Amino acid sequence: MKKKEYHRFLGKYDGYKYGWFCAAREFLLILLIVIIIFNVFVGVSRVDGSSMEPTLQHGEIVFFNRMGADYQKGDIVFARMPSGEYYVKRIIAVEGDEVDLVDGMLYINGVAETGAYMQGTTLPQEGIVAYPYTVEEGMYFVVGDNREVSMDSRSFGALVESSIKGKLLLFQ
């Protein structure tokens, strides 16, 4: 009579007696890896509102890199605003840059900001920002692409780097 062989790798004896256990164990391992990736390295959010149109539409799902990044002008970031809410915005100025708002146009270091992503007229907002505004060390000036409806650094000033939770990787 043939002795039943235990399959160390499959976690079962000849046949399917322990096959369900092996499948469940593999599923849980994969689930654990996915949870770790999405809690440590990558974040997921949904765009709420029209402040980033035409680049991002209301309801779009975005993925962002949670690991510290070297944020640059033009980067789209996921950040916590002073109100405590989380929003997706674009960095238009970094530390040392001077932001000015003249006749509906934003100027960064004396150069008019232009880009295919911009929509609407840039108007000043009620808040603490007086122009020209110099971005302090470790801070970022963020705005929405749809300037007419966006609540952004024009009203609350530049964001400290620690309030930026990540740079967008993908959006659909």
Can you annotate each of these PLM segments?
Residues 90-100:
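RNA pseudouridine synthases
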Residues 128-172:
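Soluble extracytoplasmic domains of inner/organellar membrane proteins
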Residues 1-86, 154, 158-172:
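Protein maturation boundaries and topogenic segments
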Residues 57, 72, 94, 135-136, ...:
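Residue-level recognition of short, solvent-exposed, well-ordered loop/turn junctions
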Residues 108-110:
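Short strand-turn-strand beta-turns centered on an Asx-Gly dipeptide
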